[in-house]
Amino acid sequence: MTNTDYQSDTIKDITPDPLGARRIVVLVSGSGSNLQALIDAQSHDRLGGGEIVAVISNVADAYGLKRAHEAGIEAVALPHREYDSREAYDGALIKVIERHEPDLIVLAGFMRILTPRFVQRFLGRMLNIHPSLLPAYQGLNTHARALAAGVTSHGCSVHFVTEELDGGPVVLQAELQVSSDDTVETLQEKVRSREHLLYPIAVQWFLEGRLQFSAEGAKMDGHLLPEHGM
């Protein structure tokens, strides 16, 4: 993917309409553990007044769809294998998402590289969570790569989605210590527990209007966040 130069005279700070419904669409590909964290936060009124109105998966039997169904949320299977190209799939996905008129799109283990058309359509109102301390270890296999590098700290990051893969402005990070006896599996579980705490907080901030995307980067309460977020 390529970087995009954002022009300050064409992109304004993006926040949800304070008078409109705070509607969330979640995209998943697998088990949906971060989705469950969001569902739990919603049930305790900790999503800034937000409501998850739909969960969409590119994998027909993703367990995340079952989680949505059990929570009374519309669950939509849109298998990517039924489309000839990435562009065709993303075009169909855009149509499904827009039927739900979301204020925010949340990627929760959605294992697809998004097309520029898709990203630009929802720029500034789409968040992702990544299992590393970005900008370190963009892409896949983050835990194995961290262990191979012998790092002593690891973690996860919430960021706005842009055309650069895992390269959008970082909002929030959680750091943890890597033990000498950690394996990929133990490190994954440690990071995942932090993800479940972090993601609902970022979603809440966005829907409360505190967290914004701008041409300069992510802003919190009107102040530009540092490169590594909060």
Predicted regions and their residues:
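N-terminal Rossmann-like dinucleotide-binding module
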Residues: 2-63
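A short, charged, Gly/Pro-tolerant segment at domain boundaries
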Residues: 5-7, 213-230
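Donor/substrate-binding cores of folate-linked one-carbon enzymes
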Residues: 41, 58, 108-221
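Short, surface-exposed acidic-centric catalytic microdomains
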Residues: 48-88
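Conserved acidic residues
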Residues: 53, 103, 124
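N-terminal glycine-rich "phosphate-gripper" loop used for MgATP/nucleotide binding
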Residues: 57-58, 81-82, 86-87, 100-116
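Residue-level detector of anion-binding/catalytic polar loops
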Residues: 74, 103, 152
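Charged helix-capping and loop-helix junction motifs
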Residues: 88-94
